[in-house]
């Protein structure tokens, strides 16, 4: 049998095999057998050396025509098989449109994010800029720049997660302030910033403590900034978050990076200052710490403390949310319980 007869026979047999294939697996096997790299057409091409030179052109042309025909028929057969499979599925699989629909569930903002977004908008409206810093910080920026050298006893006030001797999970967002302070160009105006973010401390988790919580620290540096400016700012923050009817007071305190240092209390939400178990019968609840920036902090950042001064404050966003919404357990913030979270949808703005 010469090659022309073999091509004619392959033509007839190939079309017959393609027409018999009823699934994609069988069709792929036919494709490999006919036009694959080791298929029948390839074998014929490899035997071209036995064809007389004057017939090689015609044989090659016949092989190419047959390959094109097989590929076209194979593609058409595959399309028909896919359509048949889909038609069968549509016939067998039905949707019962009489079943009741399932209502889509909309998420809601986390209560801490509600407080965070509200405070960020509030401070931006007062001309502050919002700064985000790294959560893995250096000892230099978290402590040394903040007037806490390595031998300072106040370091024991913060149980810090150290990664190595120089790097740590930040225990406060003060590092953001230090980074901005040392780069700020005061010839272009005062520095007003807030730095929100996660902080970490080696606390045992319970109803009032967490190894991770959200903090926002603020910093204002300019000429002629006074304690009165700080007091007015803190009062505005407290009344904005907790309501205009809240009374406030400042108490002396101690923080290494401010001097003088104060803590702010607001009148108890439960008893309006009359005294109850929530406020430990004092009528007041502590909400934040603040103070006038220590001259050493300014000098560490290359700022002349004889010319510039300012104030700083730190807000625990978890604590603000606990107080504002009457939450009993700080761990509720981190359990991802939808039943707990969805009750704050009405607080979104």
UniProtKB/Swiss-Prot annotation:
Cofactor(s) essential for the protein: Mg(2+)
Location(s) in or outside the cell: Cytoplasm
Main location: cytoplasm
Protein keywords: Aminoacyl-tRNA synthetase, ATP-binding, Cytoplasm, Ligase, Magnesium, Metal-binding, Nucleotide-binding, Protein biosynthesis
Enzyme class, first EC level, given as a word: ligase
Gene Ontology terms, MF aspect: ATP binding; catalytic activity, acting on a protein; magnesium ion binding; phenylalanine-tRNA ligase activity; transferase activity; tRNA binding
EC assignment: 6.1.1.20
Residues that, per the record, bind Mg(2+): 259
BP-aspect Gene Ontology terms: phenylalanyl-tRNA aminoacylation
Superkingdom of this protein's organism: Bacteria
SUPFAM superfamilies from the UniProt entry: Class II aaRS and biotin synthetases, tRNA-binding arm
Reaction(s) this enzyme catalyzes, per UniProt: tRNA(Phe) + L-phenylalanine + ATP = L-phenylalanyl-tRNA(Phe) + AMP + diphosphate + H(+)
GO cellular component, as recorded: cytoplasm
Xref: NCBIfam families: pheS (TIGR00468)
HAMAP family with a match to the protein in the record: Phe_tRNA_synth_alpha1
Subunit structure: Tetramer of two alpha and two beta subunits.
Annotated protein name in UniProt: Phenylalanine--tRNA ligase alpha subunit
Organism this protein belongs to: Lactobacillus acidophilus (strain ATCC 700396 / NCK56 / N2 / NCFM)
GN (gene name): pheS
């Amino acid at each position: 049998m010469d090659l022309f007869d073999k091509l004619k026979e392959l033509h007839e047999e190939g079309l017959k095999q393609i027409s018999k294939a009823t699934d994609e697996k069988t069709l792929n096997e036919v494709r490999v057998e006919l036009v694959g790299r080791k298929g029948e057409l390839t074998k014929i091409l490899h035997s071209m050396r036995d064809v007389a030179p004057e017939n090689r052109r015609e044989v090659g042309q016949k092989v190419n025509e047959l390959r094109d025909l097989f590929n076209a028929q194979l593609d058409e057969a595959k399309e028909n098989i896919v359509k048949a499979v889909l038609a069968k599925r549509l016939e067998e699989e039905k949707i019962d449109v009489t079943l009741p629909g399932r209502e889509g569930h909309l998420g809601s903002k986390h209560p801490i994010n509600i407080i965070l977004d509200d405070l960020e908008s509030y401070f931006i409206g007062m001309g502050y800029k919002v700064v985000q810093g790294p959560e893995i910080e250096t000892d230099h920026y978290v402590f040394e720049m903040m007037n806490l050298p390595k031998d300072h006893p106040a370091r024991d006030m913060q149980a810090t997660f150290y990664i190595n001797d120089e790097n740590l999970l930040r225990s406060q967002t003060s590092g953001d302030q230090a980074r901005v302070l040392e780069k700020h160009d005061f010839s272009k105006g005062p520095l007003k910033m807030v730095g929100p973010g996660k902080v970490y401390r080696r606390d045992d988790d319970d109803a009032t403590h967490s190894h991770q919580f959200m903090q926002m620290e603020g910093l204002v540096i300019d000429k002629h900034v006074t304690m009165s400016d700080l007091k007015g700012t803190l009062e505005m923050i407290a009344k904005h978050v907790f309501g205009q009817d809240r009374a406030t007071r400042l108490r002396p305190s101690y923080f290494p990076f401010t001097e003088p240092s104060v803590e702010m209390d607001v009148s108890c939400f439960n008893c309006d200052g009359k005294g109850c178990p929530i406020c430990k019968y004092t009528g007041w609840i502590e909400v934040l710490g603040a103070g006038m920036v220590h001259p050493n902090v300014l000098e560490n950042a290359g700022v002349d403390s004889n010319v510039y001064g300012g104030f700083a404050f730190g807000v625990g966003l978890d604590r603000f949310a606990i107080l504002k919404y009457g939450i009993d357990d700080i761990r509720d913030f981190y359990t991802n319980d939808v039943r707990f979270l969805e009750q704050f949808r009405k607080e979104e703005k």
